[in-house]
């Protein structure tokens, strides 16, 4: 296999929301049997067919960086975590549909990551106030994913999904709600799979295009040799 271009996507959210299970499902198409806490950052890779089924179809590596920790961590922890926010091409914000606090904390996660990207001085936001206009010029594609959909009682599902729809609107992002213990939730052709593919296409276009045309290469581009690959863990 020829070497492939890659993009870097952060996976952010509170501890316990199911980020590791989500990444495993996205990259291995399998349910993660024994999820554990992520210390530092764990990186897994997914193959993605850009514009699949069109003459522009091309295979890319999607690096998914599962960042551990709590949004309320001490400033020293945030400073350490900030190293993972460099050269980001996309962000997946993950929240637990059964935990409203994890949804609210996505605003703080986005501020932390985007401010690190927009302000290379390392200044991080410490309060939880979110102004939609604050990142109006943000060019990094976002996707909001709600986990543990299976744990939402049918009687409350409409209320919860309405709330998450407003959440995604705040980020000007599409939303996916799923059960990470069910591989069918991302089955080919499903609405979730279409949204996910559309998000990855957008990330690739932002990274490798100029005025809408894909560019052959960038001087800072990293390449991966074809063949087997495995997860990387940064502690």
UniProtKB/Swiss-Prot annotation:
InterPro entries referenced in this protein's UniProt entry, alphabetically: P-loop_NTPase
Sorted UniProt keywords: GTP-binding, Nucleotide-binding
Family matches, as Pfam families: Roc
Keyword set includes Cell membrane: no
GO MF annotations, alphabetized: GTP binding; protein homodimerization activity
Residues the entry annotates as binding GTP: 16-21, 148-150, 179-180
CDD domains found in the cross-reference section: RabL3
Protein's UniProt keywords contain Acetylation: no
Domain of life per record: Eukaryota
Residue ranges, annotated region (Small GTPase-like): 1-235
SMART domains: RAB
Annotated GO biological process: B cell differentiation; natural killer cell differentiation; regulation of protein lipidation; regulation of Ras protein signal transduction; T cell differentiation in thymus
Subunit: Homodimer.
Function comment: Required for KRAS signaling regulation and modulation of cell proliferation. Regulator of KRAS prenylation, and probably prenylation of other small GTPases. Required for lymphocyte development and function. Not required for myeloid cell development.
Family recorded in the similarity comment: Belongs to the small GTPase superfamily. Rab family.
Designated name of the protein: Rab-like protein 3
